[in-house]
Regions:
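Repeated scaffold domains used in trafficking and secretory/extracellular systems
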Residues: 62-66, 124-131, 171-181, 214-223, ...
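Loop/turn-rich, solvent-exposed surfaces of beta-rich toroidal or solenoidal domains
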Residues: 214-261
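A short helix->beta-strand "capping" segment at the edge of beta-propeller domains
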Residues: 34-60, 117
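Short coil/turn segments that connect the beta-strands within blades of beta-propeller domains
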Residues: 71-72, 136-137, 182-184, 226-228, ...
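Residue position within the beta-strands of beta-propeller blades
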Residues: 76-77, 141-142, 188, 231, ...
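A short beta-strand motif characteristic of beta-propeller blades
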Residues: 51-57, 114-122, 163-168, 204-210, ...
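Beta-propeller blade signature
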Residues: 93-112, 152-160, 245-259, 307-315
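Short, conserved, GDST-rich strand-edge loop motifs in beta-rich repeat architectures
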Residues: 77-101, 144-148, 233-249, 302-308
Length: 316
C-alpha cells in the first residue's frame, strides 16, 4: 500500500511561516526543567487554577487528541471520524469492534487560534493519532487503528519543515508517545494507558509493563525534565442515581520515566463549556518559574483552547 502523507498549506505568507517553523524555541521547552517536577509536586486537589485565556480555534478541530507547544506555535493531533467503529456482540479475530474510517491530522495554529498547517497522517485503518510530545528536535506522533489491541505507525515530524517521517510500526494501539530527551528511548502508552511500552528508535520493544494505576487513563504525556514525565487524562465513572450519563474525572500525574512509577498525582475538577473535564484529551503544561500554566482543548469540532495558571508555588 502506498504511504499517505499530505501537507496542506493554509493561506498564510510562506516567508513568515517558514521563519516561524525554522526557529522553534527549543530552549524555552528546557527552561526551568530542573524545578518543574518539584513545582508540580506542590499541586493538589485544593490548588486554585485561574483561567487566563480562552482562545477560540478558527477551524474544525474534529476530535482533538494531543498537544505540544514550540515557541509561540501550538501543535495538536486530532482524528476526523468518517465512519465510527461499531462494537461486535462477540469478539472477532481478537478485536472487539470494527475499524471504522477516518483521517488523522496534526494541526499547527498560532496564539490567535488561526490554522497555519494541516498535516495528514496515517494509512488505511490506522487513522487515529494519539498524545504527542516534542523532544527538543522533533514532534513524536502515534497513529493507530481506532480500537484496542490493534496496530500503530510511529512518526516524527520536523517542526522546521513540517515533514513527517515514519519511524516504525508496532502491534498494539499506541495512544501516546514521547522521547526520553533528544536521543533517548521512546516511552509509550497503550489504549487506555493500561500498558507501558519502551521502544528504541527502530521500534524494538525494550520493555512492556502493566500500568498499576487505575486512577485515570493517560491521554497525553510530555517530558518534565530530570527523567520525569507528566501525563494528563480522564476516566469515566457511572453517575449516581437514575442518570445514564458518565461522570468525567480528570487528573494529572508525574511519573519517573525510568521506572514508570508515579511520583505525584492529583484530580482536576475544571470543566469546559460543553461539560467536559479539561484534561479529557490535549493538555500541555508549561513551567514559567513562578507558576504552572495548563493549556487544554477538551471539546470537539468547535473548540477553544483554555489557558489556566496557578501561582503561589514555592520555587526555591
Amino acid at each position: 500500500m502506498k504511504k499517505m502523507f499530505f501537507t496542506v498549506a493554509i493561506a498564510v505568507s510562506i516567508v513568515s511561516v517558514t521563519t516561524a517553523f525554522a526557529n522553534p524555541d527549543g530552549l524555552q521547552q528546557k527552561k526551568n526543567e530542573n524545578q518543574f517536577a518539584e513545582s508540580f509536586k506542590q499541586l493538589s486537589r485544593d490548588t486554585a487554577w485561574e483561567q487566563k485565556e480562552k482562545v477560540d480555534l478558527k477551524f474544525n478541530t474534529y476530535h482533538p487528541q494531543g498537544m505540544t507547544k514550540i515557541g509561540d506555535l501550538y501543535y495538536m493531533s486530532s482524528v476526523e471520524i468518517l465512519e465510527k467503529p461499531v462494537k461486535y456482540e462477540e469478539p472477532r479475530d481478537g478485536y472487539d469492534r470494527t475499524t471504522g474510517k477516518g483521517i488523522g491530522h496534526l494541526f499547527v495554529f498560532n496564539q490567535q487560534g488561526e490554522l497555519l498547517k494541516d498535516i495528514r497522517l496515517g494509512e488505511g485503518d490506522m487513522y487515529h493519532p494519539g498524545g504527542i510530545a516534542f523532544d527538543g528536535e522533533s514532534i513524536w506522533v502515534s497513529v493507530a487503528e481506532y480500537r484496542p489491541n490493534s496496530e500503530s505507525i510511529i512518526y516524527k515530524v520536523d517542526p522546521k519543515t513540517m515533514q513527517p517521517q515514519e519511524m516504525f510500526r508496532t502491534n498494539d494501539h499506541i495512544g501516546g508517545i514521547l522521547r526520553d530527551g533528544e536521543k533517548g528511548n521512546l516511552k509509550a502508552v497503550s489504549w487506555g494507558s493500561r500498558t507501558f511500552y519502551e521502544f528504541d528508535s527502530k521500534g524494538k520493544v525494550l520493555s512492556k509493563d502493566s500500568n498499576p494505576s487505575h486512577f485515570i487513563d493517560y491521554q497525553d504525556c510530555e517530558s518534565a525534565g530530570k527523567d520525569n514525565m507528566i501525563c494528563s487524562g480522564i476516566t469515566e465513572l457511572p453517575q449516581q442515581g437514575s442518570s445514564t450519563g458518565k461522570y468525567e474525572l480528570g487528573g494529572l500525574a508525574l511519573l519517573d520515566m525510568k521506572t514508570m512509577e508515579i511520583e505525584h498525582e492529583l484530580p482536576i475538577s475544571l470543566v469546559s463549556s460543553q461539560g467536559h473535564t479539561v484534561t479529557r484529551n490535549p493538555v500541555y503544561l508549561e513551567n514559567t518559574g513562578e507558576a504552572i500554566k495548563l493549556f487544554a482543548v477538551p471539546d470537539d469540532d468547535k473548540s477553544s483552547m483554555l489557558v489556566y495558571e496557578t501561582t503561589k508555588l514555592n520555587t526555591k
